[in-house]
Amino acid sequence: MTDNTTRLDHVVLWVSDPVAAAGFYEKNLGFEPLRVGEYTAETVSFPSVRIDDETILDLAPRSMAARMRMLPGADASAGHPVNHICVSLSAHDFDALRARLDEQSIPMSDLSHGAYGARGSARRSFYFGDPDGNIIEARHYE
C-alpha cells in the first residue's frame, strides 16, 4: 500500500563545498551522507544527507546556480532565500548536539522555550549556522 500523505521530501541548501557540508551534517546531526562518492566522481550534480526515512537535504554547490532553469530567477537564489530549517531531536540528541557544537566553538543562540512548530510547542530550541551561513534550528518536544 502506498502512503500518499503530503509531507516534506527535501530542502536544497546552497553550499560552497558540498563534501565538507555533508561532513558537517554527518558529524553534528548524524545525517547519513548520500551520493558523496558519485559527486566527487562527477556523475551527479550534488550530494545529499538523509534526515530520516523520507526526508533529505540536497547540498547544491553555488556554482550550479547559473545552470538553474526550472523557474525564471532561480539562478538568483544562490544567496540565502531560506530563512532557516528546523530539525527535531530527542532530548538526549539535542543535548549531545549542543555539546558537539560547543566543543567546536560553533556559535549558538541562547535556548528558547515553548517555540511553536510542527508538533506544537517545543520544550527547548536554539539556532546555529553551518559553514555556508545556512541557519539551522534544533529543538525537542518531549
Q: What is the predicted function of each stretch?
A:
Residues 60-88:
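Helix-adjacent hinge/juxtasegments
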Residues 13-64:
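Core segments of cupin and vicinal oxygen chelate
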Residues 43-45, 83, 122:
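Exposed loop/turn and edge beta-strand positions of beta-sandwich/beta-sheet ligand-binding modules
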Residues 1-22, 82-85, 89, 139-142:
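N-terminal beta-strand motif that seeds the catalytic metal site of vicinal oxygen chelate
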Residues 3-4, 98-142:
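Vicinal oxygen chelate
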Residues 35, 66-72, 111, 115, ...:
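A short, acidic/glycine-rich surface segment
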Residues 20, 92-97:
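Short, conserved charged micro-motifs
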